[in-house]
């Protein structure tokens, strides 16, 4: 049997596709394209949160005006549209873990958690319950057949590449998902929106952290976890106490501006000692990292990760969404998975993702990745930090 444009057997009119509609231009264009091609399209929007500042600010997602925009687009396309109340689930699976992670001194990525749980687990099951053959989204990433399964690849428009936030997508989910925008540049997507007469054609893109009003994540964390605003010491990696801070929630590893101390030297946040409410600072070279140990690894390569050779596997690693993939070696032994960064990286923090690719091109395959549990710096900085933390532990035990 021949395959349709979604690589599914059967004619488009016999193929039901649920489209995850956020109310933005990308997911609206996905619904419009599929409807134009003759598919049986059903729009679904998740109501994830509903607090005043986010509902009314421009660029939010999955609340207030966005839900209304998705409804209007669906009506103009002539497709059924459903709104599902996932507020409690979103808080449980995304917002609370986000706050907990920050309190523990990590730098979390809530978009990954949202994709991993709410969007690609709960919503996917809803799509199946609706009898859909596939769930389509407006993410900028590509998938195509790879033997009996499908594999993920970076999109044509690398400026919009969302593969970093999708590394935790499981093989089962990948096989069911479709990403119709992966082969299109953003400018063309907006042109298609104009052609389709969509009311959201000129709507601005949503923010990375959709549930944080005005981008001030410290406000929501302080409200959910007041201890994150507890004051503490700002300590140099060499052991000197330089000043005080008003909560580790206001700091992140790699930060230079707004540290709150003036010593005449360029200082960066190199570690957040959450247990002792300390912000550890030091020179830029103390941030240099060459090895990261991963947890919650989602491996999408063809060879089982446990079967990697002792010499490791040459890959390209991305440790921040805004940075390009860089040469690295992936290793796995004794139940541990780690990545050795050939050129080193600065500002790596626990809680961030390390995403793995076949190369650094826009056609690179996504091999999955994991969350950074810990990292190793240059030997001198690593020893100084180890000594500083050990002294704090002794003081706490005394």
From Swiss-Prot:
It is an enzyme of class 2 (transferase). One of its GO terms (molecular function) is ATP binding. One of its GO terms (cellular component) is cytoplasm. Gene3D superfamilies: Adenine nucleotide alpha hydrolases-like domains, HUPs, Translation factors. It comes from the Bacteria. The active site is at residues 114, 210. ATP binds at residues 20-27, 46, 138. Its main location: cytoplasm. Belongs to the MnmA/TRMU family. This is tRNA-specific 2-thiouridylase MnmA. The gene is mnmA.
């Amino acid at each position: 049997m021949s395959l349709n444009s979604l690589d599914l057997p059967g004619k488009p009119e016999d193929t039901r596709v649920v489209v995850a509609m956020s109310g933005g231009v990308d997911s609206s264009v996905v619904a419009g394209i599929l409807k134009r091609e003759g598919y049986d399209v059903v729009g679904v929007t998740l109501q994830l949160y509903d607090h005043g500042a986010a509902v009314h600010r421009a660029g939010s997602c999955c609340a207030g005006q966005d839900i209304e925009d998705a409804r209007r687009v669906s009506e103009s396309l002539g497709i059924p549209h459903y709104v599902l109340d996932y507020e409690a689930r979103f808080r449980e699976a995304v917002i609370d873990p986000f706050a907990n992670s920050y309190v523990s001194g990590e730098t979390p990525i809530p978009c990954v958690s949202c994709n991993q749980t709410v969007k690609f687990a709960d919503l996917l099951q809803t799509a199946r319950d609706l009898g859909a053959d596939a769930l389509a989204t407006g993410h900028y990433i590509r998938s195509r057949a790879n033997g009996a399964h499908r594999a993920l690849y970076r999109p044509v428009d690398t400026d919009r590449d969302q593969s970093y936030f999708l590394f935790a997508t499981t093989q089962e989910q990948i096989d069911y998902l479709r990403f119709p925008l992966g082969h299109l540049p953003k400018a063309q997507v907006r042109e298609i929106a104009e052609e389709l007469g969509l009311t959201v054609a000129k709507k601005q893109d949503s923010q990375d952290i959709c549930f944080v009003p005005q981008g001030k994540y410290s406000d929501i964390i302080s409200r959910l976890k007041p201890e994150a605003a507890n004051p503490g010491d700002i300590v140099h990696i060499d052991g000197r106490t330089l000043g005080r801070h008003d909560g580790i929630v206001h700091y992140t590893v790699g930060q230079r501006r707004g540290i709150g101390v003036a010593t005449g030297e360029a200082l960066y946040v190199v570690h957040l000692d959450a247990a002792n409410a300390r912000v550890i600072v030091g020179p830029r070279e103390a941030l240099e990292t060459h090895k990261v140990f991963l947890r919650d690894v989602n491996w999408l390569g063809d060879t089982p990760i446990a079967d990697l050779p002792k010499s490791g596997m040459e890959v390209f690693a991305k440790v921040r969404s805004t940075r390009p993939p860089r040469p690295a070696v992936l290793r796995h032994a004794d139940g541990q998975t780690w990545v050795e960064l050939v050129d080193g990286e600065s500002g790596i923090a626990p809680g961030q993702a390390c995403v793995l690719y076949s190369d650094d091109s826009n056609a690179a395959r996504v091999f999955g990745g994991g969350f950074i549990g810990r990292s190793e710096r240059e030997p001198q900085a690593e020893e100084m930090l180890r000594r500083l933390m050990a002294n704090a532990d002794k003081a706490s035990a005394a």
